Amino acid sequence: MLKEITLDIYHLLHPKIAFFLTSADKKGNPNVMTCAWATPVSEEPPLVVVCVAKESYTAELIKQTKEFVINIPTKKLLKALWVCGKTSGRDVDKFKKARLKGIGAIRVKPLVVEGCIGYIECRLWKAVDAGECYAFFGKVLSAYGDDNYIQKGLWTKSAEIPLHLGGSRIVYFK
């Protein structure tokens, strides 16, 4: 029997990859948040979109510096995903709090999270007001991944990428 869903209808579109979204302020100070709302939207030009709460520090930084990185972790970084998802970077260095190491990206100023297995570096193409969120469309400047987990352009079963089901539920891609 089908039942109408009136709250959290977006959960029908889950699971989504849980990832780190990195940004930086104008001085280059790093920030990281946990996110699951992202999708490719165009191959030519290569565009992705991430949706971020308007009041978040990350949204403020992306609007200022116009760059961000999608960092795809494995389950080894699950604790750090939770820390970065429960804390604002406005007053706390989340890299330090989550015990993450940031390393230089190839084409943008925001750092990439060491230990992730995939990275998508983006320059802001367009920001769209989308209810309580901004939808940040990013032009992909560079995308790369760990070849131990990618074969023929696809993730291998051993990647163990966290998938967010909604709420506090996470499963792993296998």
Feature map (PLM): residue ranges:
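Basic, polyanion-binding surface patches
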Residues: 1-174
